[in-house]
Regions:
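Short beta->alpha linker loops
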Residues: 71, 92-93, 128
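Short, glycine-anchored, charge-dense loop/turn motifs used at functional sites
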Residues: 20, 110-119, 123
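Short, internal strand/loop/helix patches
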Residues: 80-115
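Cofactor-binding loop segments of dinucleotide-utilizing enzymes, especially the Rossmann-like FAD-
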Residues: 38, 70, 114
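Short active-site neighborhood of thiol/selenol oxidoreductases, capturing the structured segment around
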Residues: 24-45, 51
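Structural microenvironment flanking redox-active thiols in thiol-disulfide oxidoreductases
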Residues: 45-83
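Non-globular targeting/processing and membrane-anchoring segments
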Residues: 1-32, 64, 81-82, 102-105, ...
Length: 161
């Protein structure tokens, strides 16, 4: 298998979240940013506060940010609490969805546009890519683009997963 690429149709996605709801890609209104992660991943720990900033930057309803955890419910809940994550965390403990998307590493983000087409794939942690994702989402929701990571932020410009 190979990582789902830009321009390809996103594999179906139906996972239960930590909140008990089931999230289905085909029922989502607007684009979905799906971020695959593991709680033990140091790069994920670096990235998730910025994903939270992205989530808070735009009104909800016109787009979705879903973290897809490859860990247990209890470990995922501890991660959420430690990092102050408020967006939905979906559980893929058996890795069925992860295998379908086949990210090369974690974190990997897939921006899935209307019609379920993958419009962007961002592996690892990349400052510039997060700001570009922000601008793309702003276009989808009709908002001014928010800078998620300013130039003077101390995070490294890139960190592999």
């Amino acid at each position: 298998m190979a990582t789902v690429a830009v321009g390809e149709r996103a594999p179906g996605l139906a996972l239960r979240g930590l909140d008990g709801q089931t999230y289905r890609l085909h029922e989502a209104t607007g684009p979905v940013l799906a971020v695959f992660f593991k709680v033990s991943c140091e790069t994920c720990r670096l990235a998730f506060p910025y994903f939270e900033r992205l989530f808070q930057a735009y009104p909800q309803g016109g787009w979705h940010l879903w973290g897809i955890s490859q860990d247990s419910s209890s470990d995922s809940q501890a991660f959420v609490e430690e990092h102050g994550v408020t967006f939905p965390i979906l559980l893929d403990a058996d890795w069925a969805i992860s295998q379908a998307y086949d990210p090369e590493g974690v974190p990997t983000s897939f921006l899935i546009g209307p019609g379920a087409e993958v419009t962007r794939v961002v592996p690892a942690f990349q400052k510039a890519a997060l700001n570009e994702l922000s601008a793309t989402i702003a276009g989808y929701v009709g908002a001014e683009p928010a800078v998620i990571i300013p130039d003077n932020d101390p995070a490294p410009p890139f960190r592999p997963g």
